[in-house]
């Protein structure tokens, strides 16, 4: 089989790799679509792992199972050849203290699990442990839509951390954020997903980005007003009568963006750090100003099974889809053009699709 191996942000190679060998309880998935993650655009993040087969936003079709061990998903369903699935690259044990408290990303099993070799390959081995966060795609949900489950799940978790009283841990419904104000900084695909989902929850949304076209997309998804970053603080203050935002999602991982986020978080509000700054870089702020406004600073890293389940539900309901986000599809092996289009911000979202093999034949290395 062929796989896209990332050696650096400007060095992606299509290489031959052997088919993964299935262990008891494992599943082999023929890829249908895999998204290019915004995180894989950060040089420091890529270089600490390279070389590696990247891609952790996958969806595909089960083509083989090793049923020496039970192939049961979290909801009790059994996987079978032909099932169309989303599979999370990390999955928790569901039994430790962290899992019982819903803090899945702090589960030791979650941090040790991975797909082999990665989503930008023609076939992927899903280890038995990862079945704890593997979901069967409903009819009508395309592979491109399925590849949005993981990034949207990160947004679900982010909004839960921004509004814990209103959204709780699972199953939040529309109108939960009626009367609440959200400010989204940065309108890449993750920022746009925040806008679309928060609008479905009934929030009043403001957003900012340097890119005027992205601001237009945000308004089409439900943002009430959008601003250029240079005018955002004053404009938000004017729009809210001085209250500023109940919650701010800071998308860019830069100290300057975080400073703007803090300045626009209202009294008793929450600033969500959605993207890390480069390790070793420092962010300083006026602690006194945050203290006397009762501002909460929280991080939101990745997601867990509660989030992926809700994300798939929102996708199936049409709240966030590949069509609504106007994603651009690139057929494998055009992985490097997909990556470069994302890096240059020429597209909102790049998704690599995998043309079907001959369904009448056994899967083979090609």
Where are these regions (language model features)?
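NAD(P)H dinucleotide-binding glycine-rich loop of Rossmann-like/cofactor-binding domains
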Residues: 93-182
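Glycine-rich beta-strand-centered segment in the early N-terminal region that forms part
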Residues: 20-34, 47-97, 138
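C-terminal hydrophobic helical "lid"/dimerization subdomain
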Residues: 247, 259-263, 305-366
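Adenosine-nucleotide cofactor-binding segment
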Residues: 178-187, 197-260
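Short glycine-centered segments of the SAM/dcSAM-binding site in methyltransferase folds
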Residues: 84, 181, 269-270, 296
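Helix-to-beta-strand junctions that scaffold the AdoMet/dcAdoMet cofactor pocket
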Residues: 265-267
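Rossmann-fold NAD(P)-binding glycine/threonine-rich loop
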Residues: 276-293
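N-terminal Rossmann-fold NAD(P) dinucleotide-binding loop
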Residues: 191-192
């Amino acid at each position: 089989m062929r796989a896209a191996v990332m050696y650096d942000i400007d060095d992606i190679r299509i290489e031959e790799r052997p088919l993964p060998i299935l262990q008891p309880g494992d599943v082999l998935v023929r890829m249908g679509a895999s998204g290019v993650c915004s995180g894989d655009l950060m040089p420091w993040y890529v270089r600490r792992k390279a070389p590696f087969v990247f891609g952790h936003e996958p969806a595909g079709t089960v083509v083989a199972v090793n049923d020496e061990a039970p192939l049961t998903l979290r909801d009790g369903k059994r996987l079978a050849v032909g099932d169309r699935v989303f599979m999370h690259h990390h999955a928790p044990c569901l039994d430790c203290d962290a899992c019982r408290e819903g803090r899945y990303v702090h589960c030791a099993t979650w941090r040790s699990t991975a797909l082999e070799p990665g989503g930008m390959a023609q076939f992927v081995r899903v280890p038995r442990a990862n079945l704890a966060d593997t979901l069967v795609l409903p009819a009508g949900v395309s592979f491109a839509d399925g590849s949005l489950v993981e990034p949207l799940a990160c947004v679900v978790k982010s909004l839960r951390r921004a509004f814990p009283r209103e959204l709780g841990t699972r199953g939040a419904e529309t109108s939960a954020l009626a009367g609440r104000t959200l400010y989204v900084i940065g309108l890449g695909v993750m920022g746009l997903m925040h806008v679309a989902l928060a609008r479905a929850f009934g929030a009043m949304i403001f957003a900012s980005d340097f890119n005027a076209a992205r601001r237009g997309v945000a308004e089409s998804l439900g943002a009430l007003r959008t601003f250029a970053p240079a005018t955002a603080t004053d404009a938000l203050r004017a729009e809210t009568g001085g209250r500023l935002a109940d919650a701010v999602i800071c998308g860019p991982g830069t100290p300057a963006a975080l400073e703007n986020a803090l300045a626009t978080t209202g009294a008793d509000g929450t600033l969500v750090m959605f993207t890390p700054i480069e390790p070793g870089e420092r962010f300083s702020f006026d602690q006194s100003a945050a203290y006397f406004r009762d501002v909460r600073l929280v991080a939101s890293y990745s997601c867990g099974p509660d989030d992926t389940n809700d994300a798939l539900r929102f996708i199936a309901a049409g709240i966030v889809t590949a069509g609504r986000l106007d994603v651009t599809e690139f057929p494998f092996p055009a992985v490097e053009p997909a990556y470069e289009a994302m890096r240059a911000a020429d597209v909102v979202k790049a998704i690599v699709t995998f043309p079907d093999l001959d369904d009448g034949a056994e899967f083979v290395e090609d």
